[in-house]
Every structure is written in C-alpha cells, then in structure tokens.
C-alpha cells in the first residue's frame, strides 16, 4: 500500500485545475444502463471508484472505450446479472439498482461497501423502489431485486439522501406514469444527473428543488456529457490553502457550489476572490476558530468536515464541528491526536482547541475524506507527516500529489517497495506511533 511522505509548515502558491466531480461521474456512468446507445462522458478522472464502476458495467455485459479523459460506454449488450466483488468495494454501486430494475426488471447486487463512516443504510433506496413496484430482499449479503415494470407514484423520502434521490430519478425515467419525489436531495450532483437524463430524452422537472417530477418514457438515447467540477476537491484545496497560508488559484470550478465553504473559511481569516469559473484564496494572518455544522446542500458539506477539523487544529480558539449527516464520521480524530492535536469527540460533535502547529507523526488514512484531512494536517504541521494506506484517498482525488506539488507542497508518494527511507525516518515524524501498531 502506498504512503504519502509530507514535509510541513510551508506556504502554498500557484494554480490548481479542479477535476470533474467523483459524485457526479459515478451516477452518470450508471446512467449508461438506461440506454442501448453509446453514452460519451468527458473530463473523466482516473480514480479507483471510476474504475470500480466500470468493472460493474463490464459484469453487466456492457463495454467501454477510454481515450484520454473521454469515456464511451456501450450498453447495447447489457443484461440482468449478479454483481458481487466490485459492488462490495464501493458505496455508489447501489446506484445500478434503479437503472437495472427499470431496463431489465431484475438484478442481484452484493451489499455495497465504501468508506466506513457510520451507518449508511440502503433502506431509503429499497423503500422508494418498493413503492414503485419492485420486490427486494436481502439474503446472505446479496440484495435481490425484481420488478414486472416499475410504476410511478408519490415517494416521500425520510431524509434528502443524494444516492436514494439519484436512484429513484433514474428508475422513474423508464417507469409507467409520473413519479413525484418529495424531500428530494438538492445537491449540484443531483442537478447534473437530471441535466444528463434530460439530454437523453427524460422528462424531469424540479431539479435543485425539494420536489421532483419525472414522467416515464419508452426509452432513452445516447448523448455526450461533461460532469460538473468537483466541489469537494475544490473545498479540500481551499481548506489546505487556508491552513498553510499563501495564495492559491483554483480553476474550472463553480464558485456558487462553494458558498457555505467560502463563508466559513472567510470567518476563519481567509480572503477569497470569486471569478466566473475560478476562485483565489489567500491567508496572510492568523487563523481564527469557527464552528461548523454539516448539512445537506446548500449547507456545509459533510465531505469537508474532516478537512475543516485539520484546519481548526492550528486556528486560535475552540472550534466545534457537528456532522448531522453521518453519525460516525470521526475516523480522523484519533489520527490527529497522534500528531498532537487537542481534539475530542462528544457524540456527533468534534471539539478542537487550536492555536499551535501540529507535530509530526506516522498516521493512517482510515477513509477518503479523513485521509485528505491528514494530508492537510501534515502540510500545515511543523514536522510534516507520513500518511499510510493511501488507497482510500485514491478513490476520490485525481493526481492529488501532482497537484499539491504544483503549488509548492513538499509531498512524495511512495509505492510499496519504495518506503524504506520513509519508515527509517520515523524517529522524527513517527515518534507518536503507539507500540504494536502495524
């Protein structure tokens, strides 16, 4: 498993180009199930979750060509199937459930995996699709679903789940009649999915609002689509720039998608200039503490609360970070403790008493966003860090090390077999590692 070797306490200057959003690309890939024609997706990042999604497409009988950053998916040879190992590796694999039921009427799917960040049940997906006429049961870790034609109706979600909203939108496009989704997610990625489906011939109204109306059609056709920029990648670089100081320009993003993040970072002392599809962030003075409560969009993203905790470690004062979306998203806390952070967990709240530079340590990336938080912590620490188990980080960040180096970060990715020097250097950065930890 690869590790990141980081030297810290250095300001960042330069330009970063933001990739297409992982959380937009994945549902777009599964949209290819809904048509027998070719779907062309542009600006696709080569990250492990995308590769996993394409393995699922292959298991379903589909094929694809990937040239540069353009992906062509051919769904004409797809068929009902049983998907096991790839589904177990990625949470978003559940998004093939609705399209498969809509087009083929059956699918068997291993219960999805992904980051371990608390309870992430699939009950909203099952409840919504069952209301459309699907029969779904779980046997020995396999989700078995069938439907003799899905039927529209009104579905009220108990929580505005992004994944459940996306699954129901895709299923509704080929259902009989009109489907109304109440308390739908309003995230930009949901709007991007609706934009693609409309180009494919779907009849969708209300994207970006809390109630969606979808009229089923006889079939969808292929098209070409460029997913929206990754607001979480952008927010990660914004937080990193604020934590380290300096001035960073972010290109190919949508500033409107980052209002909650920009507002909170400015409260901490960052200076942000918004342009049409760019953003400049700089921080010259002292960081100030701020409280954060993660909420569904347009609130502060749950996918950025771990990174904000890393920033809060060096901000003067006490920050309280509450995640209202995932109750167990605190895997970064024990790792930041290894670096000397004054941080504690109280139920859903993470309390950070900041004000000084973190020390160095060898830490483990327990999930995607916690891994990003540890990189930010290492870059802003006085002694840097070694971040192990980088496979989680690879799931969601494209060329992260290369992009960080371009703005002056001293970071090196070491593959297995190249890690001798990093491990020998742990007297400096790994002194806080407890005995017996592998």
Question: Over which residues does each language-model region extend?
Answer:
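Short, structured segments at the rim of ligand-binding sites
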Residues: 1-438
């Amino acid at each position: 498993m690869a590790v990141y070797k980081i030297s810290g306490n250095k300001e960042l200057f330069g330009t970063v180009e933001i990739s297409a959003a992982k959380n937009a690309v994945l549902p777009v890939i599964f949209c290819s199930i809904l048509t027998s024609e070719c779907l062309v997706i542009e600006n696709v990042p080569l990250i492990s979750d995308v590769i996993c999604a394409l393995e699922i497409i292959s298991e379903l009988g589909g094929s694809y060509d990937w040239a540069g950053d353009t992906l062509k998916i051919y769904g004409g040879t797809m068929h009902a199937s049983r998907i096991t190992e790839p589904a177990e590796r990625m949470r978003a694999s559940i998004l093939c459930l609705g399209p498969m039921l809509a087009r083929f009427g059956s699918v068997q799917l291993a219960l999805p995996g992904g980051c371990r960040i608390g309870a992430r049940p699939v009950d909203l997906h099952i409840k919504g699709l069952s209301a459309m006429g699907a029969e779904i049961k779980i046997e020995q870790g396999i989700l078995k679903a069938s439907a003799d034609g899905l039927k529209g109706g009104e579905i009220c979600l108990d929580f505005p789940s992004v994944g459940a909203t996306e699954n129901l939108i895709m299923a509704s496009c080929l259902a009989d009649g009109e489907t109304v989704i109440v308390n739908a997610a309003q995230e930009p990625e949901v709007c991007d999915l609706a934009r693609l489906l409309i180009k494919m011939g779907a009849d969708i109204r209300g994207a970006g609002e809390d109630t969606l109306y979808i009229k089923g059609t006889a079939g969808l056709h292929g098209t070409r689509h460029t997913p929206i920029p990754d607001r979480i990648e952008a927010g990660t670089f914004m937080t990193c720039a604020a934590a380290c100081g300096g001035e960073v320009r972010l290109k190919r993003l949508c500033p409107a998608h980052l209002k909650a993040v920009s507002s909170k970072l400015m409260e901490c002392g960052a200076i942000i200039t918004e342009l049409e599809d760019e953003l400049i962030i700089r921080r010259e003075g002292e960081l100030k503490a701020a409280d954060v409560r993660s909420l569904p969009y347009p609130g502060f993203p749950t996918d950025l609360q771990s990174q904000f905790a890393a920033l809060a470690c060096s901000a003067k004062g006490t920050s309280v970070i509450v995640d209202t979306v995932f109750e167990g998203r605190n895997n970064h806390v024990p790792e930041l403790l290894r670096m000397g952070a004054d941080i504690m967990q109280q139920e859903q709240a993470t309390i950070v008493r900041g004000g000084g530079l973190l020390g160095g340590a060898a830490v483990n990336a327990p999930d995607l966003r916690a891994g990003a938080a540890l990189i930010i912590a290492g870059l802003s620490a006085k002694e840097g860090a070694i971040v192990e188990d980088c496979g989680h980080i690879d799931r969601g960040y494209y060329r992260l090390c290369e992009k960080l180096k371009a703005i002056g970060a001293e970071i090196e990715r070491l593959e297995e077999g190249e890690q001798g020097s990093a491990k020998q250097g742990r007297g400096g950065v790994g002194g806080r590692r407890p005995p017996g930890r592998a």
